[in-house]
């Protein structure tokens, strides 16, 4: 137990990025896949570089080419690749493969997860800074139904490399938060920006679903994004789930 001295004030000690990835890797039961398409090719490497990944990473998928991505996950009705629909297809498809290929009778204690992202970074003309969807489907007890966290981010940095690096850090924070902060979703939101400059990215949509989050009101978390300065505006639907404002208001007439 750490020594406490008179006059001390409580504070939270933020684990380093390497410590977060290593804690995941050193857990005997956490086991899953990474699927990253488009420009978001940075998350899995943190888990490889910190060591101990052989018992954690079942597979990494990098489907950069659009035709190859369509061949795996199917073509979207709107032909978009950076979308919530594509992200959910990736999560479901990769989890299905994991369940199919890993014998549960031989791996009774395994906690399966799938992390996925689909991202576009800043364009050559630097007019469109880029955005992306990322998410994780996971369980904290063997054979329990999966819970899911999905989020949409917008980049504010002005070069591709910086955007990719920031996304990689946030991906590690999301995976770590899913397993070790799922009982405190509001805190989990804050931890997504560990080791990231708040001005580098914006989170404008996040949804928590599944058995771990049955008592969570996503509308409250949506407002928390605004309170924390992670975004300027949020939107949610009648079902209580958060919506992407840019998508819902695209080409719509608005009266304010």
Residue ranges of model-derived segments:
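Non-catalytic terminal extensions that flank enzyme cores
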Residues: 2-255
């Amino acid at each position: 137990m750490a020594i406490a001295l008179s006059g001390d004030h409580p504070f939270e000690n933020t684990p380093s990025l390497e410590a977060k990835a290593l804690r995941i890797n050193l857990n005997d039961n956490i086991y899953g896949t990474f699927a990253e398409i488009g420009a978001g090719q940075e998350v899995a490497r943190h888990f490889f570089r910190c060591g101990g990944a052989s018992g954690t990473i079942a597979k990494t998928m990098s489907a950069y080419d659009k035709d190859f991505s369509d061949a795996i996950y199917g073509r979207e009705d709107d032909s978009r690749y950076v979308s919530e629909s594509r992200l959910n297809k990736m999560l479901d498809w990769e989890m299905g493969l994991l369940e199919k290929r890993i014998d549960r009778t031989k791996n009774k204690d395994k906690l399966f997860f799938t992390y996925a992202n689909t991202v576009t970074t800043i364009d050559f003309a630097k007019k469109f800074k880029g955005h992306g969807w990322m998410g994780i489907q996971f369980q904290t007890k063997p054979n329990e139904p999966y819970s899911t966290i999905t989020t949409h981010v917008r980049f504010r940095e002005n070069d591709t490399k910086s955007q990719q690096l920031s996304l990689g850090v946030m991906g590690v924070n999301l995976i770590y938060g899913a397993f070790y902060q799922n009982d405190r979703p509001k805190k989990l939101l804050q931890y997504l920006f560990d080791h990231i400059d708040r001005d580098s990215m914006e989170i404008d949509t996040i949804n928590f679903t599944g058995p771990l989050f049955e008592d969570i009101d996503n509308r409250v978390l949506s407002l928390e994004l605004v309170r924390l300065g992670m975004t300027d505006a949020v939107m949610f639907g009648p079902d209580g789930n958060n919506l992407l404002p840019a998508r819902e208001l695209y080409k719509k007439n608005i009266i304010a």
